[in-house]
């Protein structure tokens, strides 16, 4: 009995793609077979899943989760990513919360747009989602002579073991999602 359909909630009238069905089936199987994840996964669902080709022959699975369920997914993030990466062998799994960007209000309009709906705010929040579970401890923006920008993001070195293997994937996913160049690094700690 396939009942993974309640693991994905898309906009009305939009059917899930074949890849999204694979992801929801994997989540459904995890819920039924893995006892420690069963209770946490019971009420969780996703909005969308996309497979991205990153530089070289690497692939990434980007799973969009509802903004309201972001905290619940973060509680089980490490275990869930480990299990999903086993199922999708050779692909890095990244969870990103679904957020909306509102266009700036027209001149003379009295409508205020919330800060969390601005392009800058959404891109910063996506950066945090992509880098999770590592915490961002610093950012530097470097302007080259030709006018291009590169953002250096310093990650907390406590979780270096959990994130170091997918730094390249995180860079590629962030570039595809936002169009901005970013470099992830761990700050050198002087003893």
From Swiss-Prot:
One of its GO terms (biological process) is translation. One of its GO terms (cellular component) is chloroplast. The modification N-acetylmethionine is found at residue 1. It comes from the Eukaryota. Pfam families: Ribosomal_S7e. One of its GO terms (molecular function) is structural constituent of ribosome. Keywords: Acetylation, Coiled coil, Ribonucleoprotein, Ribosomal protein. This is Small ribosomal subunit protein eS7y.
């Amino acid at each position: 009995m396939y009942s993974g359909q309640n693991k994905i909630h898309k906009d009305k009238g939009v059917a899930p793609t074949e890849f999204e069905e694979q992801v929801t089936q994997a989540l459904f199987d995890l819920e039924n077979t893995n006892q420690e994840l069963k209770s946490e996964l019971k009420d969780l669902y996703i909005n969308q899943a996309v497979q991205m080709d990153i530089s070289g022959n690497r692939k990434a699975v980007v799973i969009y989760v509802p903004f309201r369920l972001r905290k619940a997914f973060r509680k089980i993030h490490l275990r869930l990513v480990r299990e999903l990466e086993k199922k999708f062998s050779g692909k890095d799994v990244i969870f990103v919360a679904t957020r909306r960007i509102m266009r700036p209000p027209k001149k003379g309009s009295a409508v205020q747009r919330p800060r969390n709906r601005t392009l800058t705010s959404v891109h910063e929040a996506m950066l945090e989602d992509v880098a999770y579970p590592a915490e961002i401890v610093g950012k530097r923006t470097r302007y080259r002579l030709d006018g291009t920008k590169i953002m250096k993001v310093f990650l907390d070195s406590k979780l270096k073991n959990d994130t170091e293997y997918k730094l390249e994937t995180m860079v590629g996913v962030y570039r595809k999602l936002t169009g901005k160049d970013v470099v992830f690094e761990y700050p050198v700690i002087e003893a």
